[in-house]
């Protein structure tokens, strides 16, 4: 009987945890973003991931930073890139390259303010085991 009570209690805790918001509820999730992984391989403690990322018109990456450097090229559409002080630090069009520094000091957001989909090819160079991006709260900007 004690085993049944413990199992019931465990099931209740698991069920309730599904209703509890995550600890990073103040983070700003992306919207309208899709990605296809082209390559994902670890070499010497560094994880290299190549992705094709599509952001729908009006979509964004959400506020975030990267544990490792990121390099990308716009293949279609237009990327508007903002720093954590809300300023636009670049508008990128097809054929233009973007590089993003790593770490908590480089919180940023990428937005598609155009009327057509934005497509980027992006290479992440991360420490193996780290996420590609870490979501953060909006730093106080009037958007997202």
Regions found by a protein language model. Name each.
Residues 2-52, 90-91, 98-99, 131-144:
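A short, N-terminal "cap"/entry segment at the start of jelly-roll beta-barrel domains
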Residues 40-42, 60-68:
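Short beta-strand/loop turn elements enriched in aromatics
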Residues 65, 73, 90-91, 112-117:
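Extracellular/periplasmic catalytic domains that process cell-envelope and extracellular macromolecules
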Residues 67-81:
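Short, conserved beta-strand element in jelly-roll/cupin
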Residues 104-131:
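Ligand-binding loop in jelly-roll beta-barrel domains
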